[in-house]
Swiss-Prot record:
Temperature and thermostability: Optimum temperature is 30 degrees Celsius.
Protein name as it appears in the record: Collagenolytic protease
Subcellular locations according to the entry: Secreted, Extracellular space
UniProt keyword list: Collagen degradation, Hydrolase, Protease, Secreted, Serine protease
Complex formation: Monomer.
Organism field: Carcinus maenas (Common shore crab)
Summary of the function given for this chain in its UniProt record: Serine protease with chymotryptic, collagenolytic and SANA activities.
GO molecular function terms noted in the UniProt entry: serine-type peptidase activity
C-alpha cells in the first residue's frame, strides 16, 4: 500500500493492495 495512510483501509481510493 502506497498512500501514506496504510493504517486506514477506507482511505485508499484505488490502493487496495
Amino acid at each position: 500500500i502506497v498512500g501514506g495512510m496504510e493504517a486506514t483501509p477506507h482511505s485508499w481510493p484505488h490502493q487496495v493492495a
